[in-house]
A protein has these predicted regions:
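Active-site glycine/GP-rich loop and adjacent strand/helix microenvironment
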Residues: 1-12, 16-27, 33, 149-279
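Nucleotide 5′-phosphate-binding alpha/beta core
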Residues: 1-86, 92-109, 113, 117
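Short low-complexity stretches enriched in small and charged residues
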Residues: 44, 52, 78-85, 129-135, ...
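Short, flexible active-site-adjacent loop segments at beta-strand->alpha-helix junctions, enriched
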Residues: 91, 132, 211
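A generic structural signal for short coil/turn motifs at secondary-structure boundaries
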Residues: 95-96, 135-136, 212-216
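AMP-binding/adenylate-forming
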Residues: 101-114, 125-185
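Structural motif corresponding to the C-terminal cap of alpha-helices
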Residues: 115, 119, 190-191
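Short helix-loop-beta connector
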Residues: 120-124
Length: 279
């Protein structure tokens, strides 16, 4: 089911987001130590931030800001935080994100509609081939989203091709959630052990962590290598801990879908200036 707001025209979506933006700014002024300081230092009057275009009046918050002021981004008392997740730390120290009950509900909604976008339906069985522990937000998000959707889940975790294939043959999942390059190892293992993977129950994979499309939305070499061997649907998805939102491909395989009820998305250049489509 497509959320109603996502079927509105651009003007209606902008009006919807502008209203939520004003509420968000007011919330930050009331609850965020970091943004209280930032708005004061930049002489930002919250009454002047009414539209997405007005965000240009506020300087960009970058990853270094979050790393250096991590605790000042928390907007609730510690006892309201139910789960702690961190970024991978590939570009420096990991950043901690504390999730409240409402945050977990939002995370579940985000993945539910993202899975629906990829064609997953209530009653389908999905094999989760990523970790759900080690402070990894995505694994938890997938579990919560599938549960909210009403789909079944086989929690296998990362790696271990023998266990992955045992689970596929034993439980017959329709979809996998996996890092695409690992699918090549799955194929190699199947071929070495006479597993008829081409006629398995698997119809599609929601692929995380690696690109499946070029800038022109053509399949990458990785996607081609997988599908030359295994004729299954490969849905690309992009997300980050900072956004707590996903951009997942539908059955048109032409790029991820933006969910305007969850996040305002802006693409900027190296000077942090907005750029037009295609730039």
């Amino acid at each position: 089911m497509i959320p109603e707001i996502e079927m509105k025209n651009e003007k209606e979506i902008q009006h919807f987001q502008n209203e939520l933006l004003q509420k968000q700014i007011a919330y930050l002024v009331e609850n965020s130590p970091f943004y209280q300081r930032k708005f004061k230092a930049e002489n930002i009057q919250i009454g002047t931030i009414k539209t997405i275009a007005d965000l240009q009046k506020i300087s960009v918050t970058n990853k270094a800001d979050v790393q250096l002021n991590n605790d000042d981004f928390f907007c609730v008392p510690k006892h309201e935080i139910l789960d702690y997740a961190t970024t991978s730390g590939t570009l420096g120290d990991p950043v901690t994100f504390g999730l409240t009950d409402n945050d977990l509900d939002r995370l579940a909604y985000n993945e539910m509609i993202s899975f629906q976008c990829a064609g997953v339906q209530k009653g389908d069985l999905i094999q989760l081939m990523t970790t759900i522990d080690r402070r990894f937000m995505a694994g938890l998000a997938y579990f919560l989203g599938l549960r909210k959707l009403g789909a079944g889940i086989v929690r296998v975790g990362a790696g271990v091709p023998p266990l992955q294939w045992d689970s596929i043959l034993r439980y017959q999942p329709k979809y996998l959630i996996a890092v695409p390059s690992f699918l090549l190892k799955m194929i190699d293992y199947a071929e070495e052990n006479n597993i008829d993977y081409k006629n398995s129950s698997v119809k599609g994979v929601i692929c995380i962590g690696e690109a499946l499309r070029t800038a022109n939305l053509e399949p990458t070499l990785l996607a081609k290598r997988i599908q030359e061997k295994w004729n299954i649907a490969l849905h690309s998805t992009y997300a980050s801990t900072e956004m707590s939102a996903a951009f997942t491909e539908c059955e048109a395989f032409s790029g991820g879908h933006h969910h305007p009820e969850l996040i305002i998305t802006e693409i900027v250049n190296e000077q942090n200036e907005p750029v037009a489509d295609g730039e």
